[in-house]
UniProtKB/Swiss-Prot annotation:
One of its GO terms (molecular function) is structural constituent of ribosome. PANTHER family: 30S RIBOSOMAL PROTEIN S12 FAMILY MEMBER (PTHR11652). It comes from the Bacteria. With S4 and S5 plays an important role in translational accuracy. Interacts with and stabilizes bases of the 16S rRNA that are involved in tRNA selection in the A site and with the mRNA backbone. Located at the interface of the 30S and 50S subunits, it traverses the body of the 30S subunit contacting proteins on the other side and probably holding the rRNA structure together. The combined cluster of proteins S8, S12 and S17 appears to hold together the shoulder and platform of the 30S subunit. One of its GO terms (biological process) is translation. Keywords: Methylation, Ribonucleoprotein, Ribosomal protein, RNA-binding, rRNA-binding, tRNA-binding. The keyword rRNA-binding applies. It comes from Pseudomonas syringae pv. tomato (strain ATCC BAA-871 / DC3000). One of its GO terms (cellular component) is small ribosomal subunit. SUPFAM superfamilies: Nucleic acid-binding proteins (SSF50249). Residues 100-123 are annotated as: Disordered. This is Small ribosomal subunit protein uS12.
Length: 123
């Protein structure tokens, strides 16, 4: 236990919380340009081909971003919006692309959970 005198001379240090999404720089989303669109395999015990894109953000960061939903229209030089949110079985992927904004289309034929995939209400 520190004495009052010690605390007067040198106060207690605050614990600095480290951000999970440093590239967003305290913004809710960021815009960027796809530099590479590819598929990758998840960690054990899962098995799939997960759709991922490398994005160069407007603030200069280059990050990997997961493309959720079935099917997408992204290619190199597509402009995308990314949000935070990691993919647990893909190491190094800490961001999600926002479906239905900028160059990213919504998921076709989606009827439930549409707001998460940028799909309009069917008529």
């Amino acid at each position: 236990m520190a004495t009052i005198n010690q605390l007067v001379r040198q106060p207690r240090k605050r614990i600095v919380e480290k951000s999970d999404v440093p590239a967003l720089q305290n913004c809710p989303q960021r815009r960027g340009v796809c530099t590479r669109v590819y598929t990758t395999t998840p960690k054990k015990p899962n098995s799939a081909l997960r759709k991922v894109c490398r994005v160069r953000l407007t603030n200069g960061f280059e990050v990997s971003s997961y493309i959720g939903g079935e099917g997408h229209n992204l290619q190199e030089h597509s402009v995308v919006l990314i949000r935070g949110g990691r993919v647990k079985d893909l190491p190094g992927v800490r961001y999600h692309t926002v479906r239905g904004s900028l160059d990213t289309s919504g998921v076709k034929g989606r009827n439930q959970g549409r707001s998460k995939y940028g799909t309009k209400k069917p008529k």
